[in-house]
């Protein structure tokens, strides 16, 4: 599992690379890394499993975090999530 960090104010603070992993693995990886960003910061998950487009926003609603956006990539998408608590 790769994680990259960025300074505050320059997009997601952490990106979790889940390309090539099938759901629910991207969500499990997100949940395991979410505590690494401060409350109010954005974490990104890159994934290419088509189920991630529905599963990640649903997980955000269930866990009461903010689903910010889905950005298409050459392979899959980047899902941005704001940590709310």
What are the roles of these predicted feature ranges?
Residues 13-15, 78:
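A residue-level signal for beta-strand positions that form part of recognition/binding surfaces
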Residues 16-71:
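Amphipathic, hydrophobic secondary-structure cores in small proteins
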Residues 1-11:
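Short, compositionally biased "basic patch" segments
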Residues 5-6, 57-85:
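C-terminal structural segments of small proteins and small subunits
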């Amino acid at each position: 599992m790769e994680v990259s960090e960025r300074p505050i104010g320059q997009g997601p603070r952490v990106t979790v690379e889940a390309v090539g992993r099938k759901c629910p693995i991207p969500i499990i990886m997100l949940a395991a890394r979410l505590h690494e960003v401060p409350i109010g910061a954005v974490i990104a998950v890159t994934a290419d499993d088509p189920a991630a487009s529905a599963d990640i926003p649903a997980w955000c609603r269930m866990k009461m975090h903010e689903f910010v956006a889905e950005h298409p990539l050459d392979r899959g998408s980047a899902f941005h999530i704001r940590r709310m608590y």
